[in-house]
Amino acid sequence: MKKIYILGNGSFAQEVFEQIIVANQIKNFGGFIILKDDKAFCIGEEGAEAFTYPPSAQFILGTANPNWRKKFYNHFLGYYELNINHWPNMAAPNSYQSLSSTIGIGNLFLMFSLVNANTQVGNFNLLCTFTSISVNCGIGNHNVLSPYSSISKNVCIENSNLLESGEILFEDLESECILTNGVVYAND
């Protein structure tokens, strides 16, 4: 049986465990994975041990920190193909993704996150609790929407952006920006 692992082991990874693994009654949980000195270790029921990179493993990016998300992604990209078999989309039972939306791979939808009609979602995006993406939107890859953040209708954002808690985005956003306190900061 193929196992699913959470990449990360902090408090956010514990939240992902409760909202995804426990709430969906997933029985093939393999453990939490950490990186130390560019080596992967699995923390499971029997303690921590070197990760053996099983060929059928599946992964959930279980950190909200953009830097750690990038480290995990880059590390495991060297061992696993970018496909839905290794990087499934995972959703809390009370999240919603419109049937008319298009969704890539490796996305994580936590409790009460909402993806409305005719929206395109790229790969490896994180929608935290109570986030929403309105109709006719598009988001690229590797974006983090913190709790209670929203993207207004007909808005597109590119890649590797961070919307801080409670922010509402009304205009398109280029790559590598942070929206906080109503101000967009380019990540130069």
Model-derived regions: residue spans:
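Flexible, charged surface loops at secondary-structure boundaries
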Residues: 1, 26-27, 51-56
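Glycine-rich adenosine-cofactor-binding loop
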Residues: 2-20
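Residues at the starts of beta-strands that form the adenosine-phosphate
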Residues: 3, 28-30, 58, 86
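Short hydrophobic segments within beta-strands
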Residues: 6-7, 62, 164
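Short, solvent-exposed amphipathic alpha-helical segments in soluble enzyme
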Residues: 20-23, 76-78
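NAD(P)-binding Rossmann-fold cofactor-contacting core
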Residues: 23-41
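Phosphate-bearing ligand-interacting subdomains
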Residues: 39-92
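Structural signal for interior beta-strand "rungs" in well-ordered beta-sheet cores
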Residues: 89-188
